[in-house]
Each structure stands twice: as C-alpha cells, then as structure tokens.
Amino acid sequence: VALLFLVFALLIASPSASPTNEGTPVYFTVRPGMSVSSIGKELHERGVIDSEMKFWWTAKLNGLENKVKTGTFAMQTGMTPRDALEKLVYGNTVTIRFVIPEGFGVKEIAERLEKEGLVRADDFMERAKTFRPYPYIEQHENVRYAAEGFLFPDTYELSDSFDADSIMTMMAENFDHRLTKEMRDRAKEMHLSIYELVTLASLVEKEAYHDEDRPIIAQIFLKRLRLGMPLQADPTVQYLLDEPKEDLLYSDTEVASPYNTYQNVGLPPGPIASPGTASLMAVLHPAHTNYLYFVADRNGKNYYATNYADHLALVDQVR
C-alpha cells in the first residue's frame, strides 16, 4: 500500500503536459453535490487540467476531497491539478454578467450558459420542458419547452452556485415583473391570454429587424388570425430545424408539425423565442394599416402589400 501511494505521489509531482490552448480563460462552476471525481472529469473535459486521476489523488492525499467550495471560479486551461484544486478550495468565486438578446430561444440560452460554464445545456433544456412557475404559462400538447418565451431577454448578474432551476426562475420572475398591470389589462381588452400575447410577440420578435416594423407585423398577424388565414411565418418553420437556414425551401414549409404556420391556421402551440418589451408592446398596440403581406430583403428591410399579387411582385423584387 505504501508503495502504491508513493507511485501516485510521484505521478502527481511529475510535470503535466500543457494543452495546446494553455491560458484560455474558463469559467468553471462547482454545483452542490458534485464529487471530487466528477469535478476532475469536467475540468479535464474542458482542458483546465490534463489528468482527472492526478486531480483526484491530489485531493485525496491532502485531505481536500470535501473542502471544494460551490460556486463559479475564474480558471484557465493548462493548470496543474494542484493549482486547480487550490483555486477551488481557497480561491474566490465570481459573479458572471450574462446577456440574453431579444429573440433567443431556450436552446440558444442553454448553449450560451454552457459556454460560460454555468450549467450544462442538456440540464437547462430538460428543466425548461416542464418549467411553469406562473399560471399564465399554459400547458399545451406538442410544446417543446414550457419555459419558452418567458425567460426575459436582459442582462443578468448570475451569482455563483446557480443551477438551471434558479437561473430559469430569475428570468421568469423578471418577465413577470416587466409584464405590467397596464399590459395585462390591454391584453384582456384584446381578448388575448398572456400565453397568446407572448406567443404572438415571439413571432414579431423573430420577424422584425427594426423597431418601426414591429407594430406593422403585429397588425398583419392579428388581421390574419381574425380572417382565419395561415400566418405563414418563416420563423415557426425555422424553429423546427436543427440548424436555421438562410433561405427556407418549399419542402421545409410542408413539414408536418403544429408549429408550422404554413400548414396550420392560428398560432403555434406556444412561443418560439423570448420577446422583448418592444415586441410585446407592438402586439398590444399594433399599427393601423391595410397590409396583409410582407417580405424582407437581405438587409432586413420589410416591404408590405395589401394583396397577394403585389406581394408576389415584391418577393421577385427583393429576392
């Protein structure tokens, strides 16, 4: 046994090969309940250390297995197992500034959180499937993520040791706070549920490149809903794709899904992204026009038409 410990002591003391990305900043989060072995595994996977075994034995031989703190730490690739361990035991945790742009969906938010080293994307997306902290987040069949649309786009100061649930809760509470009494009352006047408001606003968010377009697009969608016309919103089809396309094919618009607003009349089952205040307000206060169609050029400029013939001419013009 003594010989075995000597071998591992020599192994730990031996110099580590430095990864090719040595010195790249890494935010690493130790979550409650993580074991030293799981911490070492993640550190190794992210290039912070070159050996999870050395990390484990360093903790074991120094009696530090249960001394690692929870929280987020500023680390870097190419650290020795000893330096990494000392950082997690004696170092200070950090607060990360995290930005969600308008129009981000659950998947994009999850991927950005994982990139920052805060939570695993899969854990976040799994929790988002059933996350309904407020009664206005309705439960519908075929909805991908219950939380979709209700994680308000904003800048967040994420304190250390936040998990997927606490991050999601903070974002949903922010949405609930931003949804003022006046906005709720206005939605009621329009005979829109909060869920319908957010769903429609998410389409506006994904379609509008410029603020001045939001009320016009909102008005077109509301009018189409009243007339029983399909919304034919490209972003609802993009939402179904693993990777967005610059240009949808006709075959894409034929995919069988309740989210496909080319094939189905009415709103999709739920929101497709997180709308900002401007898109929510556009739905609540739409423009007054006779437009029924619109198309955007490569620069995001929208062109509007009142009839299908004019719309087709605009499509030929901009594409």
Where are these regions (language model features)?
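N-terminal post-signal-peptidase region of extra-cytosolic proteins
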Residues: G23-V26, W56-K60, V68-T70, T93-T95, ...
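N-terminal type II signal-anchor transmembrane helix
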Residues: V1-G23
